[in-house]
């Protein structure tokens, strides 16, 4: 293959790869986004000192827990979620929480012994158990209970990181969620996956939207493994309306399915940018009523972040590696995908989607031909057309074209006969009995050397005979 054709093939293949990289599928958009979404857990634990059968005990009951979703906006560990997801840790309802923890402690440490002394089995007399619990709660003063609120973030590789609440906007009191129900969390981490904030002002009714989060119904499903529960779920829908909450603040209505636990998760547009944060769902007698869920616009998130040190334009090294690996994978360059995918796994180990795509790329690379023949074939066809076009262009530039012997004979009989040059090789000329009448004998070597030039009017048509 000649060098110009090789160069042309390289250019065509490069252009094809570049065009493919700009056209992301929904699958690739979702895979890019998922690692940046995490579980947010708010807990209130503590220590309860109470009397069990005349003996004083200090008990650490099972903490009260609320969970939701959140997503990283900065590789330095800044994460956004809903305010109501972390409200129990930010503003613990002390009276209710104290009674809750006392009950938990009493049922775990004191109740079994009291029932045994009364000759009762657990669950045999529920009304007796409830009465004993009420007595214990009433007899335990609040100063015997120490509350310990905490917030943590669980990544999709199962890692649990302690978090602090850096900024908080409470939901509207007594009137459900407000639409400015936001919290900014910080974990001690670097190279986190991130999502970019989009322009909620550009969102239109009918636009496609994808919501990523951790619905409780999936997190608590008895048929799923612990690894499966740690992976985010994705639902799809459209923007159905623009409304205002009770505080007259704008919210976006969507028919994308959402459940408890999805709160705080990102709502993505068709480009994978965050245009909102899932905030509340419509509840009916049987649970959430799907098709009527609401999203805080990303413009409100930007306003909420003002005055903080969150850098929204900071590059995530994980994103760079993960996105490059996905681009190679979806373009069919499975072997080339290995390096960026390995880098993504090094920066954030054991993310299920990274492991799955890596394994699939390795399997496909083993059965992939050395060259992408589909692309090569297409490029060769394009190169053929391009080469033919170049040839025609060069001939037109040089006024060169082929004519048949019969056409030459016709021209010789015309009023302006052409000049005939016999440019056959010397050996061929000497061996051949063919001689062309009124032709001029000259070799190509003579023409190239610039020595022997035929005396021909440049305005005349020149026919060269070389076969």
Give the label of every model feature segment.
Residues 21-82, 180-183, 194:
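N-terminal activation segment of mature serine protease catalytic domains
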Residues 83, 87, 94, 248, ...:
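C-terminal subregion of chymotrypsin/trypsin-like serine protease catalytic domains
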Residues 451-467:
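Catalytic cysteine-centered active loop of the rhodanese-like fold, especially the PTP/DSP P-loop
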Residues 25, 65, 152-178, 195-250, ...:
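Flexible, gly/ser-rich surface segments that form the specificity/activation loops bordering the active-site cleft
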Residues 352-374:
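Short, aromatic-rich amphipathic segments at membrane interfaces
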